[in-house]
Amino acid sequence: MALTRLLIKDFRNIESADLALAAGFNFLVGPNGSGKTSVLEAVYTLGHGRAFRSLQAGRVIRHECAEFVLHGRVDANEREASVGLSKSRQGDTKVRIDGTDGHKVAELAQMLPMQLITPEGFTLLNGGPKFRRAFLDWGCFHNEPGFFTAWSNLKRLLKQRNAALRQVSRYTQIRAWDQEIIPLAERISEWRAAYSDAIAADISATCALFLPEFALSFSFQRGWDKESDYGELLARQFERDRALTYTAVGPHKADFRIRADGTPVEDLLSRGQLKLLMCALRLAQGEFLTRQSGRRCLYLLDDFASELDTGRRRLLAERLKATQAQVFVSAVSAEQVADMVGEKGKMFRVEHGKIEVQPQD
């Protein structure tokens, strides 16, 4: 799975770019503010329908332009596909696949599985549970065909239930929602639990390589007491939910807890160690997908050198090379990515939103 070509129009500070990409490493080098991260964000947006630095379309559309347009050629298991995405300032989104309109963003996400590693990505480890739920849900989305529909339906039903809690006085008035919510909640929790169990060995092996000085443990918390029946719990907690005006327990409260030597990792590890752990989790997840389905992720690394010394950068470079996946890496200087440069790599110089191929010695 790789992007062979990327066209960018009116995205962030990039007016226009047409990039022929390497199947291996693609390095984006240039000073801060030059547009390196914008290229990474364009790749990410093509696969997700939204940018990773802003959820508002207007903020990523170039100044005084009506929309951004992204287009890519995808080499997927010896089959080439064409994908496109445009978004207007009003939020209108158009997805095109192989020349036809009317497709969903979820189809792009399925075609272009990506792992994003950014300085803001520490939230996976020291942010709230929603970031770790997203980690599990990425895996479930790519491994369970019914997950996306089930999770979308559950979110819709929970939103309706929460709205109803503001208006009802008896549990019987919201029982109809619970009858739909309960089977979805149980199925989603089963998928998440199965995925966390299945990927545990990959995570442990990768973490042992990156952080051998710590004994790391991982546990999935489904969002309600494991000894309780979810339906009975919803009925029992109705008055509390009504007072709160939201549903306090369920898969929307799940977590994937990570400890080092029995202590929450955010309380023990340095920033450099947290970045290594974040990279280990992303790599393990990508490698698990490859083993399960034969598909390879695209890895996007922004500000590669931050928080990592030379030895750790070299270790990460070796692991990324071993995946044989397509990798996009931004750095301030070519020296920072010297350990990654190889015959399958391509170097791009980015300045003021202009992108040029830079010859490698």
Curated annotation (Swiss-Prot):
GO terms for cellular component: cytoplasm. This is DNA replication and repair protein RecF. NCBIfam families: recf (TIGR00611). It comes from the Bacteria. ATP binds at G30, P31, N32, G33, S34, G35, K36, T37. Keywords: ATP-binding, Cytoplasm, DNA damage, DNA repair, DNA replication, DNA-binding, Nucleotide-binding, SOS response. Belongs to the RecF family. Its main location: cytoplasm. It holds the Pfam family SMC_N. Gene3D superfamilies: P-loop containing nucleotide triphosphate hydrolases, RecF/RecN/SMC, N-terminal domain. GO terms for biological process: DNA replication; DNA synthesis involved in DNA repair; double-strand break repair; SOS response. The RecF protein is involved in DNA metabolism; it is required for DNA replication and normal SOS inducibility. RecF binds preferentially to single-stranded, linear DNA. It also seems to bind ATP.
